[in-house]
Regions:
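Acidic, low-complexity mobile loops and tails
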Residues: 1-51, 84-123
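Residue-level recognition of beta-strand microenvironments
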Residues: 12-14, 58, 75-78
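Structural motif
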Residues: 18, 69-71
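A short, glycine- and basic residue-enriched loop/turn
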Residues: 49, 55-62
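Periplasm/extracytoplasmic soluble domains of Gram-negative envelope assemblies
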Residues: 57-60, 68, 101
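ATP/adenylate-binding site constellation spanning eukaryotic-like Ser/Thr protein kinases
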Residues: 66-69, 113
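Short, charge-rich, low-complexity interaction segments located
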Residues: 72-88
């Protein structure tokens, strides 16, 4: 399983034709204490870099964009009652949803962890 990152600070962990999606540790840190996550509906069809979900924190409200195209097949219901999990474990337990990817080759438009870390240094 490999992680890929977008310039908007979302990640996707790819396993076969599914991708688990969340926001990066960097994004979670920048947001501050997360107070609410608006999860997508299971069955929602999304396009790469299109709107997927939303997240609110003490500092800001932000949209979450889909790093890949496909259909949402699962959501992290834990976040409905404990959104702070995103702060505690943004790239593991704080995942947002799972997408059945319609075009797995789209990950080629994303960054590896190493490339993302280099990108962050340039911000």
């Amino acid at each position: 399983m490999s992680y890929f990152f977008s310039k908007e600070h979302e990640w996707v962990k790819v396993s076969g034709t599914t991708g688990t999606v969340g926001i990066s540790e960097h994004a979670a840190h920048e947001l501050g204490d997360v107070t609410f996550v608006e999860l997508p509906q299971v069955g929602k069809v999304v396009k790469q870099f299109g709107g997927l979900a939303a997240i609110e924190s003490v500092k800001a409200a932000s949209d979450i964009y889909a790093p890949v195209s496909g259909k949402v097949i699962a959501i992290n219901e834990t976040l409905e009652n404990t959104p702070e999990v995103v702060n505690e474990s943004a790239e593991e337990s704080g995942w947002i949803c799972v997408i059945e990817m319609s075009d797995p080759s789209e990950v080629e438009q994303l960054m590896t962890k190493e490339a993302y870390d280099a990108y962050l240094k340039g911000l």
